[in-house]
Amino acid sequence: ADIVMTQTPSSVSAAVGGTVTIKCQASESIGNELAWYQQKPGQPPKLLIYRASKLASGVSSRFKGSGSGTEFTLTISGVQCDDAGIYYCQQDWNSNNVVNNFGGGTEVVVK
């Protein structure tokens, strides 16, 4: 059976300078094979975090990924207006070598 990725919350509002926490749960263990992306309207997704906690090149250290197994978290600290967008977790490996298995997305609104 396919692994299901469940993201919470579906939407979150944050003040500039605040902190946002997004959670992603896998229906079975995926080790640390979890990526986080940010997407803005009309743009392709931008990789933020790979292997659960590794910061992609050029990405601000305000973004932090943690977790392993089935429970993962993306934390955005010192939220800036430019952080607004939709964030997705992605299972980037499974036993069937199926990729591009994304969570449902979390909209981040910055006030």
Swiss-Prot record:
PROSITE patterns: IG_LIKE. Residues 58-89 are annotated as: Framework-3. Residues 36-50 are annotated as: Framework-2. GO terms for cellular component: immunoglobulin complex. It comes from the Eukaryota. InterPro entries: Ig-like_dom (IPR007110), Ig-like_dom_sf (IPR036179), Ig-like_fold (IPR013783), Ig_sub (IPR003599), Ig_V-set (IPR013106), IgV_Light_Chain (IPR050150). Residues 25-35 are annotated as: Complementarity-determining-1. Residues 102-111 are annotated as: Framework-4. One of its GO terms (biological process) is adaptive immune response. Residues 1-24 are annotated as: Framework-1. Residues 90-101 are annotated as: Complementarity-determining-3. Residues 51-57 are annotated as: Complementarity-determining-2. Keywords: Adaptive immunity, Immunity, Immunoglobulin. It holds the Pfam family V-set. This chain was obtained from antibody to type III pneumococci and was isolated from the serum of a single rabbit. This is Ig kappa chain V region 3368. It comes from Oryctolagus cuniculus.
